[in-house]
Design a protein with these regions (language model features):
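Basic nucleic-acid-binding alpha-helical/helix-turn surface characteristic of O6-alkylguanine DNA
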Residues: 1-104, 150, 154-156
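Helix-turn-helix DNA-binding helix
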Residues: 106-109
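Residues in the recognition helix of alpha-helical DNA-binding motifs
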Residues: 112
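Terminal helix-turn-helix DNA-binding modules in bacterial transcription factors
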Residues: 115-117
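Major-groove DNA-recognition helix of helix-turn-helix-type DNA-binding domains
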Residues: 121
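Short cysteine clusters
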Residues: 124
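…primarily DNA-binding HTH/wHTH and HhH modules…
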Residues: 130-156
Length: 156
């Protein structure tokens, strides 16, 4: 079963989806998709909502909600590497590629970062270009900037 609920945040209303195994999707207002709404209570959704609320209040730096991400083995290795980027820090796509043992795979790594179904929770907003420029983000660059600023990372 897919559980679904929404959370009002400083960035707008996020749509959260979970299975019995874990959180499976976080969508920004510009990507709400079909069937946005509420379903029966689910402990994973409740935990994700509380952790996101604490994150936006500046009280949480590392998420612990169980995850149920669906993707290729390569994508999952990239997403796992993203969870190791510390709060308030940024890395390049090349850094992530090196972290998964594929140093010549910066471009495919970028594709996997862009396919991340769990933005914020799996912090793809902390990945920037090798030249320190901001690159695409599923919620839009303005939201990426807001998340980095929330974490104390000033972007010029």
């Amino acid at each position: 079963m897919i559980y679904r609920d929404q959370l009002s945040t400083p960035l707008g209303t996020l749509t959260l989806e979970a299975t019995d195994r874990g959180l499976s999707s976080v969508r920004f207002p510009n990507r709400a998709g079909p069937c946005a709404g509420q379903s029966p209570d689910n402990s994973v959704i409740s935990q994700a909502k509380q952790e996101l609320t604490d994150y936006f209040a500046g009280e949480l730096k590392q998420f612990s909600v169980p995850l149920d991400w669906q993707g290729t083995d390569f994508q999952q290795s990239v997403w796992e590497a993203l969870t190791n980027i510390p709060y308030g820090e940024t890395v390049s796509y090349a850094d992530v590629a090196r972290a998964i043992g594929r140093p010549k795979s910066a471009r495919p790594t970028g594709g996997a970062v862009g396919a991340n179904p769990l933005p914020i929770i799996v912090p793809c907003h902390r990945v920037i270009g090798s030249d320190q420029t901001l690159t695409g983000f599923t919620g839009g660059l303005n939201i990426k900037v807001a998340l980095l600023e929330l974490e104390g990372r000033l972007i010029e």
